[in-house]
Regions:
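A short, Lys/Arg-enriched amphipathic alpha-helix followed by its capping loop at the start of a domain
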Residues: 52-59, 101-105, 159
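Short, conserved acidic/polar surface loops in the N-terminal third of protein domains
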Residues: 75, 95-98, 121-125
Length: 286
């Protein structure tokens, strides 16, 4: 049975509101970019994800780090809208399924890695995922590993973007003390940089709930030296936006084309406006 989101998306797309939303977004400026966040892309969903990539490639430019920085400086890649595709949680499918398909289309992925998940012995990774709110499908592999390996992370960094997604996949709530924030943010950044032998300038907050954001975590992210930081509060990216408050919109590999169109339409941005403004005020550092 279709979910409520699928049914709503189908109705809105049938009414043409998805196309109207894209046109309205385009009228607000010469170019705009939307960041999407994915999680697990299991092998049985590879064809679905490939269809989504084909849909994106027909309509959007792919944005990497240099493209995004140029946009912030007022130099969009082209007159077409852009997309940033991010993949959270350091899952094995990101190397096995996602990266080869992205490369087939000539697209760049942004992979957000929680350090401790990669460090966890394979036989303990399912338990770690359950204890730290990392969702995954029931993959059938020849071994117990469900996380990226460090070799995977290094390989991804060669053609894609690797960002920090905390140490333990922890929501950076107001309840965390200074020691916990040190572990989750600067320590995780240093470890990724040591493994990759290159700077890691990109961060992604864990969780989209309002309580998952805090002023002190925002200051630590800024002080640690990150210059791009992703949240999940639904808004397009435009020149002049705060680079440590980049909003994302959730899409998953199993979402129908109607759901994808709905998520891209900007209609959800309106519903998230009040929350987004509260979170942005809370996490303003510059």
């Amino acid at each position: 049975m279709p979910s409520k989101k699928q049914t709503l998306a189908r109705w809105l797309c049938a009414a043409g509101l998805d196309r109207l939303g894209l046109r309205v977004q385009g009228l607000l400026g010469p170019s705009f970019v939307r960041a999407l966040n994915y999680h697990d892309v299991p092998p049985e969903r590879a064809q679905d994800f490939e269809r989504q990539l084909a849909f994106y490639a027909e309509r959007f430019d792919c944005y990497g780090v240099s493209d995004l920085r140029a946009l912030y400086a007022g130099r969009p890649k082209s007159s077409r809208p852009g997309l940033i595709l991010t993949f959270d949680d350091g899952l094995r499918s990101h190397a096995d399924v996602v990266a080869p398909l992205l490369e087939q289309f000539g697209w760049t992925g942004w992979f957000m890695v929680p350090v401790a998940f990669v460090d966890t012995p394979p036989e303990e990774q399912v338990d770690f995922a359950a204890a730290h709110s990392i969702g995954h499908k029931n993959h059938v592999y020849d071994d117990a590993r469900i996380a990226l390996s460090w070799d995977d992370v290094r390989a991804l960094s060669g053609k894609h973007v690797v960002g920090c997604h905390t140490w333990n996949h922890t929501r950076l709530a107001d309840s965390l003390d200074a020691a916990a924030l040190e572990e989750e943010i600067p320590r995780a950044k240093r470890r990724l940089e040591a493994e990759l032998n290159q700077p890691v300038d990109v961060f992604a907050w864990v969780g989209g709930e309002e309580a998952a954001y805090s002023a002190q975590a925002a200051r630590v992210i800024d002080d640690a030296g990150f210059d791009l930081s992703f949240m999940t509060n639904n808004a397009v990216i435009r020149p002049g936006d705060h680079p440590l408050q980049i909003q994302r919109t959730n899409v998953e590999a199993w979402d129908s084309e109607a759901v994808v169109r709905f998520q891209l339409s900007g209609l959800l941005d309106l519903g998230y406006r009040a929350k987004r403004r509260r979170v942005n005020r809370l996490t303003e550092t510059r």
